Amino acid sequence: MKIVVPIMPTSLEEAQALELSRFEGADIIEWRADFLDKHSILTVAPAIFEKFAGFEIVFTIRTTREGGKIELTDGEYVTLIKDVAAIYSPDYIDFEYFTRKEVFDQMLGFSNLVLSYHNFEETPENLMELLSEMTNLTPRVVKVAVMPKNEQDVLDLMNFTRGFKAFNPEQEFVTMSMGKLGRLSRLAGDLVGSSWTFASLDNTSAPGQVALADMCRIREVLDAD
């Protein structure tokens, strides 16, 4: 299970001030570019990709449609992704599949997509159908983050993940149940077949994230013989 740490600079100065030593133990850096305005993303990008050249990087623009900070038209969303991809070739590119279906055909040439679905309100009853639709597109990663209302929601997500991984062993899945109630799902990735877990430094990018130092210790305990 790889540990992903999101970074959320709101300016070039904040990006330049990020201290690499604080990311010890992280495997992947997720750059949440939506904390910038759309005109600043390409200005800040060189600082991000140069500083974190030793890590795998997920480029994410989490828009307001799925709980993010920036509002973009479909055209602006795709153009920004393509511009950053052409210049910096991030290891992974997040794509908000269900809210951007109309322009998904423009992304078919990308082999490094993280097809994602985020629901900060609930765990939808049709979660299996959502997972199935994304899995059938065979992206690099299928990512689902949902909010539980009760313990059964958490267990359902974990069981669905395990089932889909069993039937699609070559497909990478990243799933999590958010908030305090869903925290167990962030720790049991190896058990259910979720490849990544997200950990935080100072600020969380989603409810229920565990601090990086704590997650490193938890992984060490879980990986011990």
From Swiss-Prot:
Q: Tell me yes or no: is NADP among this UniProt entry's keywords.
A: no
Q: What is the lineage of its organism?
A: Bacteria, Bacillati, Bacillota, Bacilli, Lactobacillales
Residues engaged in binding 3-dehydroquinate: 30-32, 62, 186, 205, 209
Recorded hits in CDD domains, A to Z, give: DHQase_I
Family named by the database record: Belongs to the type-I 3-dehydroquinase family.
Role = Involved in the third step of the chorismate pathway, which leads to the biosynthesis of aromatic amino acids. Catalyzes the cis-dehydration of 3-dehydroquinate (DHQ) and introduces the first double bond of the aromatic ring to yield 3-dehydroshikimate.
Q: Which residues form the active site?
A: 118, 143
- State the name under which the record lists this protein: 3-dehydroquinate dehydratase
- Which InterPro entries does the UniProt record give? Aldolase_TIM (IPR013785), DHquinase_I (IPR001381), Type-I_3-dehydroquinase (IPR050146)
Please tell me the species this chain comes from: Streptococcus thermophilus (strain ATCC BAA-250 / LMG 18311)
What pathway does this protein act in? Metabolic intermediate biosynthesis; chorismate biosynthesis; chorismate from D-erythrose 4-phosphate and phosphoenolpyruvate: step 3/7
Gene Ontology molecular function terms on file: 3-dehydroquinate dehydratase activity
Q: Which keywords annotate this record?
A: Amino-acid biosynthesis, Aromatic amino acid biosynthesis, Lyase, Schiff base
